[in-house]
Every structure is written in C-alpha cells, then in structure tokens.
Amino acid sequence: MRKLVYYVGTTLDGYIAGPGGEFDFFPLSDQMTASMNERYPETVPTHIRPHVGMGNPPNRVFDTVLMGRGSYEPARSVGVSSPYAHLRQYVVSTTLPDIDDPAVNLVRTDPSAKIQELKTEEGQDIWLCGGGILAGELLPEIDELIVKRYPVIAGAGIPMIAGTFEPILFTPTANEVFDNGASVTWLKRNS
C-alpha cells in the first residue's frame, strides 16, 4: 500500500513559513540542496528544474503530490498552473476557483477520503507538500515524516501541523546534518 509522506522544511520553533507565507528566510546550502534533490528529484517544481541544472530525472519515491492552496499559490501567482507536471497533482481548497489545467485536480471536500482512495491505488508514495492546516487535517493518514529542520527561529508563522491536541508517536529512522546547520530527520509512524 502506498504511504502518505509529509516532506517539509521547518524552523526550530516549528514554523514552515512566516505569517504572510514567506519562506525566503530559511538558510539554504548547496550541500543540502544537492543531497535532497538527488534523493527526491520529483519534489523540485517542473518550471524550476532548468534553472537548477536538472533535466527530467525519473521519480524516485513519489508519483503524486497533495498540497493546500497556500502551497499551490506561489506557482499560480507567477502564471504556473501545473507546478509539478511530472507528478499527479491534487490541490485541496474550498475557496480556490476552478483550476484551468487538466493536470491539476481540485479536491473541495474530505481530503482524508481522497488520501484513503489514493493509498489503495498502485504506484509510488504520495507526497504531502503542505501546508500546516492540511497536514493537521490529514494527521491520521500520515505514515512518514521527512522534516528538514533549519537553524532559525521565526517566532510566529504557519505551523508545521495545525490541529487539535492529539499526540501521535513517530520513530526516527535516520538523521543527517548539513554544512548550514540544518538537519533532516526521517520518521515512521508507530503502529
């Protein structure tokens, strides 16, 4: 069965973006970018690939992406309606007008039911791209986490997971530290 994997970058205090959705304050490094792009090339948006010297590598882990409106809007705001054309794309939103691109599927209700349906299909894993509100709604469905933790404190912003108090244990399976002080931790949900 396919897994839902929340692959996300966060501050030390648990924010994936600033209050206005900004994320340009994360300290990036060539070492970290190269490592993560090698492992997960499908997470690089299609329109960005030529600018980072990436051709069209095969999808290694994911063949489907699910994102909330806030994660979809940055591409849409620059005229890109299909940011991950190399993946099956689902955008969860109750407020977004219809999407004029047949490659992007709009999910207006019950994202959990959509994930349960997608998990039964053949294929690679499903990448939960964000955001925090959607991750909170889908927390019971999240099987694995890949958390890029950057050495910065934001103080406020969009939390990694917004929801109700519902502790769920995950077990770390690997951790890697990079030259910019950031780390990536891979975690699996406890049974």
Locate predicted features.
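Enzymes that bind and transform nitrogen-containing heteroaromatic metabolites
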Residues: M1-S191
